Amino acid sequence: MAYDWRKEEYEVTRPGRTRIDYRQEIGRAHIPIGIEREFTVLDPERAEALCAWVSTLIPARGERPAAGDVGAAEYVDATVFLTPRLRGVLLDGIDTIDQLAQERAGRRFAEATPLERTEVLRAFEANDPLDAFPMVRDLTYEAYYAHPRVLDVLEQETGWRYEVAFSGGELEPFDEDLLARMRTVPPRWRKT
């Protein structure tokens, strides 16, 4: 990965393509997990294909829901909405898996069987010039394993309870007079 100081971004190149490092981009987006939302970037056909994609990555098993059932596809869409440079990567990835499904199974990706979808995704992952597959995979895992419904099932299965690390702890009472000097310091920001 090379840093292009003229463009002020990291870029990774492969023969014939320049691709953006999606990890740098998605770090700028914060999407709450577990909230129902609508698709904003994808049209209905692509949204259906993305739901099938994430549900193929993490299918339903026992009490555990499929990734598509807990809003992982909508989470990917919302993340890409906040990082416009990745929209083309996602759209190209969805169009490519649909094309591969047409070639291999004779139907759209969303209409293919789970086995056909798995084969299509393996072929796509092996020759993915823009890193759409790892981007969707990483965002799917993030949305799935932080979803309250999935965490409840994991707690029932294992007894392990997830505690949100960034929620902060209880602040012990202290003498507020210790903050007197800080209250006199001028702000360190500029009003706009």
Predicted features along the sequence, with ranges:
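Charge-rich (often acidic), low-complexity intrinsically disordered regions concentrated
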Residues: E38-V41
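Mature-region segments of soluble proteins
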Residues: M1-D21, I31-I35, A47-E48, A52, ...
